[in-house]
Amino acid sequence: MARVAGVNIPDNKHTVIALTAIYGIGRTRAQKICEATGVKPDMKIRDLTEEEVEKLRAAVGQFPVEGDLRREVSMNIKRLMDLGCYRGLRHRRGLPLRGQRTRTNARTRKGPRRPIRK
């Protein structure tokens, strides 16, 4: 298994698919990385040379991925909550942020039903 950005990426998958195992890299970004480094997207990770893996590491290193990206996202959410804006309040209360109805739906965001106590 090749190790890129602190993640073991699977050997038996094509390069484009294997790169998506890294948090912050989806299909489109993985294709752009392969294009920029000159690595064939349909080549398996185990068939890559060490030089090609190094190119991939360098290309992935230019983007915020894994821990840095997770920290950035959580800091953005925390900032919204500290500001006290509408989105921050919705985050704090665990409700949907983008205008969805909450009277009947939104079970995923609100969690399981709690019985009404008398």
Swiss-Prot record:
Name of one Pfam family that matches: Ribosomal_S13
Described purpose of this protein according to its UniProt entry: Located at the top of the head of the 30S subunit, it contacts several helices of the 16S rRNA. In the 70S ribosome it contacts the 23S rRNA (bridge B1a) and protein L5 of the 50S subunit (bridge B1b), connecting the 2 subunits; these bridges are implicated in subunit movement. Contacts the tRNAs in the A and P-sites.
PROSITE patterns the UniProt entry points to: RIBOSOMAL_S13_1 (PS00646), RIBOSOMAL_S13_2 (PS50159)
Stretch forming the signal peptide: none
Annotated GO biological process: translation
Family (UniProt): Belongs to the universal ribosomal protein uS13 family.
InterPro entries per the UniProt record, alphabetical: Rbsml_uS13_C, Ribosomal_uS13, Ribosomal_uS13-like_H2TH, Ribosomal_uS13_bac-type, Ribosomal_uS13_CS
Gene: rpsM
Listed GO CC annotations: cytosol; small ribosomal subunit
Keywords for this protein: Ribonucleoprotein, Ribosomal protein, RNA-binding, rRNA-binding, tRNA-binding
Protein name: Small ribosomal subunit protein uS13
Stretch list, region Disordered: 94-118
Subunit structure: Part of the 30S ribosomal subunit. Forms a loose heterodimer with protein S19. Forms two bridges to the 50S subunit in the 70S ribosome.
Species the sequence originates in: Thioalkalivibrio sulfidiphilus (strain HL-EbGR7)
Taxonomy, superkingdom: Bacteria
Gene Ontology molecular function, alphabetical: rRNA binding; structural constituent of ribosome; tRNA binding
